[in-house]
Amino acid sequence: MADIFDYISRRGDLTFEQDGFNELDALVISRLSYLPFDGSVSSCLFDEITLEQAAMRVFATDDYEKNLLWKGDADLLKATAESKRFGKILVSGYVNEVESDVSMQFSAITFEFLKKNYFISYRGTDNSLVGWQEDFNMFFTFPLPSQKKALDYFEKAVRLLNGKFILGGHSKGGNLAVYAGAFTDENSRNHIDYIYNFDGPGFSLDKIRDSGFYEVDDRIYTFVPQSSIFGMMFEHEESYTIVKSNQKGFLQHDIYSWEIEQNSLVRLKSTTNFSVFFDHTLKEFVESLTIAQRREFTKEVFALLSLTETATFNEMLKNPLKNTGTILKSFAGLDSKTRNMLLKTIFAFVKSAKNNFSDITGGQKSIEITT
């Protein structure tokens, strides 16, 4: 079961002039945006350094490991930086912003892999409470603050760099890439070669119909694993490709579990019952709530989480008993109207899950979650 590390090992000795850009390169660079380049890569698009130099700076930082979002990220940075293919890529324009007052988490970085050929990589959701709250806000807010930032970042890059662009990202980062391509002006859109969305949510149809989506949809490449959850949220008007993960359920969101063959991801014909079940359940649940109810539920849930006085889920999990106790105590202390609203909403989700479980399994007691 080969993965992207095998790809880097096998093809890392070939430059982009020797072997052209492909979907695995897009996957690798999309993941690199999760690395903590703070203080290592300039926010200025003209202040470029090589990925090799950027990696040396990151690894020289004493506390870089605590800022890693996934255990494979440090290995990915090391492998790419040491390779001929990725190590000499020029990186610049690193932005990493978290604004709790508007529930926004946004990060992006630009890679120049060939002269005047750029890949803008948008980071997906990190482990901050703010980042996750923004994801929940997607069900009642459009556009999100991070979507606006993604568009501004791209249009600024076009004005300053005036080259050819590939936009891409994993998870929310993929959604940001598609948003930037769909909602930009015609001139900027003409600079786009491709857009890559790796297991990122789609959009409500009524939103994209008011955009330039259909002017760029033939350049969008969307990939989801067979039991995709996040990537199947909302609608994908563009066609999408189902790829094989060696993990199960939610863990398939991890791109390090995606299997490759030569220069491509391994294709499958369909998603699993698990993915269909969760997709139908979530859609039914969301549609059962008004916009106001969605907003109120999200507000109260994250208000409870904020009482733990932690900024990230990692911090919260360092003292699970204390923080769980804080949340439960705070929940019990809520006024009856708010408490009943939260319980009613949770029960609505359980009801949707029960209905869809029966519909999809045909009365069976289990559903398949792997292929």
Segments (PLM) and residue ranges:
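Gly/Ala-rich beta-loop-alpha elbow adjacent to hydrolase catalytic centers
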Residues: 168-173, 177
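Short glycine-enriched nucleophile-adjacent loop
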Residues: 177-186
